[in-house]
Design a protein with these regions (language model features):
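Periplasmic-binding protein-like
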Residues: 3, 79-87, 156-181
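Short, hydrophobic alpha-helical packing/hinge segments within bilobed ligand-binding/sensory domains
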Residues: 24-25, 46-49, 140-143, 149, ...
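Flexible hinge/capping segments at coil-to-helix
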Residues: 87-104
């Protein structure tokens, strides 16, 4: 589990794992007579962790893609999510084409990364011809706030939660996105 994927799975102020996916997993496993143990992992290594037997399954934030279907078995999805573009409110970025020449942050190993590469002409227009990769979305947002990147592309559920916890007036979510999952 990615323990930085708020509001789905994250650590509260006491260091306890909480969130929608945590509650759902406990309920599903409990109803079936199983005890669940959560294992935070490096998200960019999720398939390696699964294939090596270090974890038994991936519960949260694991989007279904054609490439991933070839590697793992999925259940039915329980959430639809978009890959949205977030900037600071005072940014002049208002469309995907405005990302040209800009530093765009994305979580490494995420389905967001897969989604943006479905539009290679957009990615090639980024500053340096590729996104700036971060281990967590939280780190990407911190660099946005510090002015080290110009935009973040992230799961809508995480981004809206993050923004709501901060000051929503400080951010802008573009109408265009990089697709749904």
């Amino acid at each position: 589990l990615d323990d930085t994927f708020a509001p789905m799975g994250f650590r509260d102020e006491n260091g306890e794992l909480v969130g929608f996916d945590i509650d759902l997993a406990r309920e599903v496993f409990g109803r079936n007579g199983y005890e669940v143990q959560f294992q935070p992992i490096d998200w960019s290594m999720k398939e390696t962790e699964l294939n090596s037997g270090n974890i038994d399954l991936i519960w949260n934030g694991y989007s279904i893609t054609e490439e991933r279907k070839e590697k793992v078995a999925f259940t039915d999805p329980y959430l639809e999510n978009r890959q949205i573009i977030i900037t600071l409110a005072d940014s002049d970025i208002s469309s995907k084409s405005d990302l040209a020449g800009k530093k765009v942050a994305v979580q490494n190993g995420s389905s967001t990364l897969d989604a943006i590469y479905k539009e290679p002409e957009i990615v090639e227009s980024f500053d340096g011809g590729e996104p700036v990769l971060f281990d967590t979305n939280h780190e990407a947002f911190m660099d946005l706030e510090a002015g080290r990147v110009d935009a973040v592309v992230s799961d809508e559920v995480l981004a809206r939660y993050y923004i709501q916890q901060k000051n929503p007036e400080d951010y802008k979510i573009l109408e265009e996105d990089f697709g749904s999952e």
